[in-house]
Design a protein with these regions (language model features):
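CoA-thioester-processing core
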Residues: 88-94, 102, 108-138
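Conserved CoA-thioester-binding segment of acyl-CoA-metabolizing enzymes
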Residues: 1-57, 90
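Hydrophobic/aromatic residues within transmembrane alpha-helices
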Residues: 17, 54, 66, 114-115
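Glycine- (often His-adjacent) and acidic-residue-rich active-site loop
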Residues: 56-91, 107
Length: 138
């Protein structure tokens, strides 16, 4: 599977989905949303996979949304939620196999939501989950 912002690795019966924008602490942009949907759909439909691990590349799980993105194709917030984020999270929560969040470093904003959507979270000593939505009036 050729994805720009996600790496998918299969080790025996385990699929590892890795957010791969380490230079931006795996900040979630539109491309990552589409790539994540493809990756989770593929893993969901692969009957040989028994467990899914979601993690981040580099020194963080995810710093949250990429607020610097200017050229998204969303037609407003409702479109982003309905076409992008709703299926993004439904693919995690409806996964017919256990989903483990392997969290190193920050999981903030949308990264925190990804972590909390997993069935189980395993965190390093320096990890933290930060819900920043109230700080930005969401």
């Amino acid at each position: 599977m050729d994805l720009e912002t996600i790496n998918v690795e299969k080790i025996e019966k385990v699929a590892i989905i890795k957010l791969n924008r380490p230079e931006l602490l795996n900040a979630v942009n539109e491309q990552l949303v589409w790539d994540f949907q493809k990756a989770t759909e593929s893993v969901k439909n692969d009957e040989s996979i028994r467990v899914v691990i979601i993690t981040g590349s580099g020194r963080g799980f995810s710093a949250g949304a990429d607020l610097s993105e200017r050229k998204a194709s969303w037609k407003g917030s409702k479109d982003a939620l309905m076409r992008g984020y709703k299926p993004f999270f439904e693919n995690i929560t409806s996964m017919p196999k256990p989903v483990i969040g392997a969290i190193a470093g920050p999981a903030a904003g949308i990264g925190a939501a990804i972590a909390m959507s997993c069935d189980l979270r395993v965190m390093s000593d320096d990890s933290y989950i930060l819900s920043v939505f109230s700080n930005i009036a969401l």
